[in-house]
UniProtKB/Swiss-Prot annotation:
Note describing how the cofactor binds: Binds 1 pyruvoyl group covalently per subunit.
E.C. number(s) listed in UniProt: 4.1.1.65
Cofactor: pyruvate
Active-site residues, as the UniProt record annotates them: 184
Gene Ontology biological process terms, A to Z: phosphatidylethanolamine biosynthetic process
Protein known as: Phosphatidylserine decarboxylase proenzyme
Reactions that this protein is recorded to catalyse: a 1,2-diacyl-sn-glycero-3-phospho-L-serine + H(+) = a 1,2-diacyl-sn-glycero-3-phosphoethanolamine + CO2
GO cellular component: plasma membrane
Disulfide bond sites: none
Length: 226
């Protein structure tokens, strides 16, 4: 039971949880009120860094959501890696209550990763996509070798982006690849002829919600727990 509890918390949260629980012990030694405040902070840390198991639909042509959150926009834009190419950008906003663990959206190979320094304006603003600190992931899809781009974007509160994959690595849809601490945004850039299956304003679940299909939608889906 303890193993399952720890396993369902992202390792980036361990230090915050340990410090806050230690502060709770010290707080209770000083006063009950201070101890309760520190304990509440500890529980909030556990909630924020939770990493639940997800039922991931299987299929190399599926594009699943890389994050929990709200779809802010779906629009055609210039590719962030090639101004001469148009792509579809799906922007997902994560508030502080969402699960912040990020997941691979499509099975394939990591073609490149890039850290881009920047500012920390609110991730709910469209200009944050170009101005804020972000980590870029380019995935070559397994089914047709097309490039799928994922940008982890820091927000007003988020000041730490973690990306745990490297160039040349083989990845599968739904696998965990990183986390953004606190409020943030994830942009997903897809080829123009991708079949989009979500809409602006929709709430999505990382690893579970199918955002798009690289080919026609399958008649039947199978799922796996990750």
């Amino acid at each position: 039971m303890l193993y399952n509890f720890i396993h369902n918390i992202h390792k980036e949260g361990y230090i915050f949880i340990m410090i806050s629980f230690l502060a709770s012990c010290i707080g209770f030694a000083i006063s009950c009120s201070l101890g309760i405040i520190c304990l509440v902070i500890s529980l909030l840390c556990i909630y924020f860094f939770r990493d639940p198991i997800r039922m991931v639909p299987e299929g190399d042509d599926l594009i699943t959501s890389p994050a929990d959150g709200l779809i802010l926009d779906i629009k055609e834009v210039n590719s962030p890696i090639d101004d001469s190419t148009q792509v579809v950008c799906i922007s997902i906003f994560l508030n502080v209550l969402n699960v912040h663990v990020n997941r691979i959206p499509v099975s394939g190979t990591i073609k490149a990763t890039e850290y881009i320094p920047g500012r920390f304006i609110s991730a709910s603003l469209n200009k944050s996509s170009e101005l804020n600190e972000r980590q870029r992931l380019i995935i070559e899809s397994k089914i047709d070798n097309r490039s799928i781009i994922v940008d982890q974007i820091a927000g007003l509160i988020a000041r730490r982006i973690v990306c745990n994959v490297s160039e040349g690595q083989q990845v599968n849809s739904g696998e965990r690849f990183g986390i953004i601490r606190f409020g943030s945004r994830v942009n997903l850039y897809l080829p123009l002829n991708t079949h989009i299956s979500v809409f602006k304003g929709q709430t999505v679940i990382g690893g579970e919600t199918i955002l798009a299909y690289l080919q026609d939608a399958p008649k039947q889906l199978t799922v796996k727990s990750i």
